[in-house]
Amino acid sequence: MDGTEGSAGQPGPAERSHRSSVSSVGARAADVLVYLADDTVVPLAVENLPSLSAHELHRAVREVLQLPDIALDVFALWLVSPLLEVQLKPKHQPYKLGRQWPELLLRFTSAPDDDVAMDEPFLQFRRNVFFPKRRELQIHDEEVLRLLYEEAKGNVLAARYPCDVEDCEALGALVCRVQLGPYQPGRPAACDLREKLDSFLPAHLCKRGQSLFAALRGRGARAGPGEQGLLNAYRQVQEVSSDGGCEAALGTHYRAYLLKCHELPFYGCAFFHGEVDKPAQGFLHRGGRKPVSVAISLEGVHVIDSREKHVLLGLRFQELSWDHTSPEEEEPILWLEFDGDSEGTPVNKLLKIYSKQAELMSSLIEYCIELSQAAEPAGPQDSATGSPSDPSSSLAPVQRPKLRRQGSVVSSRIQHLSTIDYVEDGKGIRRVKPKRTTSFFSRQLSLGQGSYTVVQPGDSLEQG
């Protein structure tokens, strides 16, 4: 499993995948099915499947879809099931990994034996975790943009990417534009929206959408705040005149959708399953645990509440130290250390994430940091490689403001976490943020001046 990146959830038996990526195997030839993010199937006839590498299958998919060379970097092959998701390295052999799937599930998930026996992975062609967002802004091929759009849309609708209502409305409006065309008051397509509202908004926002349809049909009914926001956003989607006609216009809307998703800190992340301790609610009442998703990208780590669909903690790599432990007969733990305060006193905080994927998460953090450091000197040069004559290049702003709404689902909620707070025993706290005076772990992002210094802490840790 060296170098693979994955994520896992714990669905019920009803959610089992019935897909398979090998439809038939002969003496030499095999029919392989590769799925796209929109559930489209790419059938491939290949020979010598057991020894075929992910790189060779990737090339075959690109040829069938007639994708440009940039797709080699943008997309990767994944082995996916409801229990585990693994991005494959080019050298990996998907067929052999598929045969080893039960062993991977036992090692990296807590799924019951019956679920492990029934689970079957399928091959999916989707975004490469290691592809930088800044390079994504330079893509102008419409089919590549469409594939990225479909994947991002699926993550938004499934609430894998938690979004504020305002962002759901803006993104849903762009989906309306792509699927229904330019907004026209009273057009017959409004009835299509009634039947396909979950194609535009996450499920938890669709429950209160009944008044939207009458408003779209012009019957005078007042839509609720969320529904009215979607309707207003649909009206305001800008149309861009282009010599390329309809296809060029769709490419503009795909790009606009991706640009909006880039504002979400967990766009393009790999997702992992874990649990964290809840804060104790009383002297004799233990808090228990809550399930979380851990989203890791080239930029940092986000811990997301799996049930409430909001961010609990968001850290850039410059803001954390980390390690993982796998004690015998105990659960593996990913440790995240970051600066905080306790009743106004600066402290170091330790967060424990219980997960059988702690090893995968730790390895991915380390590799993402290595890639970021290696790419940093080339940043300004890469940003200048876009074609200045391309009018769509002006749609990519150099820098976008971060979301800072009060109560935003992407804002950290550290108060909902149970952490261990500590300072160096026997010494006063002397530091100027963000520089750390004490570090429990030695694994950090080193950026030279201004990076954290490693000082051994005292022996005793104080429970926060």
UniProtKB/Swiss-Prot annotation:
Record keywords, A-Z: Acetylation, Cell membrane, Cytoplasm, Membrane, Phosphoprotein
Location of the region described as Disordered in the Swiss-Prot/TrEMBL record: 1-22, 376-408
Coarsely, its chief localization is cytoplasm
Pfam family name, one: KRIT1_FRMD8_FERM_C
Tissues expressed in: Widely expressed, with high expression in heart and spleen.
Which residues carry the post-translational modification Phosphoserine, per the record? Answer: S24, S383, S387, S408, S439, S446
* PROSITE patterns attached to this UniProt entry: FERM_3 (PS50057)
Q: Could you tell me which residues carry N-acetylmethionine?
A: M1
Which InterPro entries is this protein grouped with?
Band_41_domain (IPR019749), FERM/acyl-CoA-bd_prot_sf (IPR014352), FERM_2 (IPR035963), FERM_central (IPR019748), FERM_domain (IPR000299), KRIT1/FRMD8 (IPR051594), PH-like_dom_sf (IPR011993)
Record SUPFAM superfamilies: Second domain of FERM
Q: Report the subcellular localization.
A: Cytoplasm, Cytosol; Cell membrane
PANTHER family recorded for this chain? FERM DOMAIN-CONTAINING PROTEIN 8 (PTHR13283:SF13), KREV INTERACTION TRAPPED 1-RELATED (PTHR13283)
The record's function comment reads: Promotes the cell surface stability of iRhom1/RHBDF1 and iRhom2/RHBDF2 and prevents their degradation via the endolysosomal pathway. By acting on iRhoms, involved in ADAM17-mediated shedding of TNF, amphiregulin/AREG, HBEGF and TGFA from the cell surface. Negatively regulates Wnt signaling, possibly by antagonizing the recruitment of AXIN1 to LRP6.
On assembly, the entry states: Interacts with iRhom1/RHBDF1 and iRhom2/RHBDF2 (via cytoplasmic N-termini); this interaction leads to mutual protein stabilization. Interacts with ADAM17; this interaction is indirect and mediated by iRhom proteins. Interacts with LRP6; this interaction affects LRP6-binding to AXIN1.
Q: What is this protein called?
A: FERM domain-containing protein 8
